Amino acid sequence: MYAVAVIGGGVSGLSCALTLADGAKRFDFAKGKKFLVVDSGSSDALKAVLNNVPGVKRGTTGEEYLSFLRAQVEEFEDVNLVEGEVCEVVKEGERFKVILSDGREFEAELVVFATGFHSFPVKTELVEVVPHLKSPRPGKIALKPKAEGVFVCGNAAGEITMVATAAGSGVSVACDILSRWAGKVVVPHDSIG
């Protein structure tokens, strides 16, 4: 069983997984935890050219950026990156079951939806679909958690639709989860020296 299942392998989902995996290496309370990322390969970032993302060379394609993020996540053996489409997520007792369209099933203690803002075809009662109020385009959606242990990040959380805010949202959710496990506010800062 996984500690966290991240549904969505775009910028926010990968940023969340990266921060969780890094935290699991740094903090005793998170050591040994395993993480799942399910990626349908449909991130909007795949169509982007990045010109205003802090720390990213101007003109970097979204595909290049996602490949870089994915490679960073793959450095952590505690993260399982799975390609597929999630069709259903249910809560069974204290656990969540993530069901893919090909029949594979995974269990996790917590679930993070990082599914974008176009549509939400996942069958679940764990989130409410609401209008995305910060999208420059009409008809986009956001998700509101309805159950304990459910988190939402990136565009799905109603964030401004930019790569930098999506990454920050994923990192913020990961810090919330790490803090939950620690019983206090925790931030996995990098240090010099």
Q: Language-model segments: which ranges?
A:
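Beta1-alpha1 glycine-rich phosphate/pyrophosphate-binding loop at the start
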Residues: 4-64
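Glycine-rich beta-alpha-beta "Rossmann" dinucleotide-binding loop(s) and their flanking helix/strand
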Residues: 109-138
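Short amphipathic alpha-helical segments
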Residues: 17-19, 123-126, 164-165
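A conserved FAD-binding loop/helix module that cradles the flavin
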Residues: 24, 153-191
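Short hydrophobic core segments
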Residues: 5-7, 105-118, 150
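Short, flexible loop segments at boundaries between secondary-structure elements
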Residues: 137-147
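Glycine/Thr-rich phosphate-binding loops of Rossmann-like dinucleotide-binding domains
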Residues: 45, 121-122, 160
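N-terminal Rossmann-like dinucleotide/flavin-binding domain of flavoprotein oxidoreductases
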Residues: 48-105
